[in-house]
Amino acid sequence: MSDWNPSLYLHFSAERSRPAVELLARVPLENVEYVADLGCGPDNSTALLQQRWPAARITGIDSSPAMIAEARSALPDCQFVEADIRNWQPVQALDLIFANASLQWLPDHYELFPHLVSLLNPQGVLAVQMPDNWLEPTHVLMREVAWEQNYPDRGREPLAGVHAYYDILSEAGCEVDIWRTTYYHQMPSHQAIIDWVTATGLRPWLQDLTESEQQLFLKRYHQMLEEQYPLQENGQILLAFPRLFIVARRME
């Protein structure tokens, strides 16, 4: 599991794309020339940007070779760069930086967010959506299974929080719009929840395990999910998925 799996990631493409659609709807820009899609993945968010601003010069950034290859195949008119978001530098200042479900993987948001703002033109926008599910059972149970089976903690850190992001971006000279939404995704089974998180949140936990260790981890994780997520009357499972949204406009 050394690289991301685009096919597995896109298995829930509608659910993963919906927050990007809702984030994009809140971006207060009409004329956009230069756009960066940070953590672009296999193209789902970049395609939305291209649909809204077909004449814009859009660059997708991702550290995954597999994701970049998939995106290049799907959107040949856009530029895609394999790079670490923290180190990538645009050729020119940007009108929009769009980051859908990517920045939560990176540390030091107190430094990262002001750095991203510095890459914007005056009146440019940083639009961010991040899963805020560190305290949800899906992610708490990952840590509990790892503790039970004597594996090191490999999960991501919790987000800084609404008030912290507001202060970080306000101090960076931005007008900030910030909100939090909880989605309730209908899952047909507990295995479907595992399929969802295997493409994202579970990756760090599983990637260094042997195949047999992965099977033991997932078996125990499945058992715990059954205890935490009851079936609805129709047999479905409601998976609560909180997400944090930020639209910050550089006012300098």
UniProtKB/Swiss-Prot annotation:
One of its GO terms (cellular component) is cytoplasm. Its main location: cytoplasm. It catalyses: trans-aconitate + S-adenosyl-L-methionine = (E)-3-(methoxycarbonyl)pent-2-enedioate + S-adenosyl-L-homocysteine. InterPro entries: Methyltransf_25 (IPR041698), SAM-dependent_MTases_sf (IPR029063), Trans-aconitate_MeTrfase (IPR023506), Trans_acon_MeTrfase_C (IPR023149). Signal peptide: none annotated. GO terms for molecular function: trans-aconitate 2-methyltransferase activity. It holds the Pfam family Methyltransf_25. Its EC number is 2.1.1.144. It is an enzyme of class 2 (transferase). It is found in: Cytoplasm. One of its GO terms (biological process) is methylation. PANTHER family: TRANS-ACONITATE 2-METHYLTRANSFERASE (PTHR43861:SF1), TRANS-ACONITATE 2-METHYLTRANSFERASE-RELATED (PTHR43861). Belongs to the methyltransferase superfamily. Tam family. Catalyzes the S-adenosylmethionine monomethyl esterification of trans-aconitate. This is Trans-aconitate 2-methyltransferase. It comes from Escherichia coli O9:H4 (strain HS). The lineage of its organism: Bacteria, Pseudomonadati, Pseudomonadota, Gammaproteobacteria, Enterobacterales.
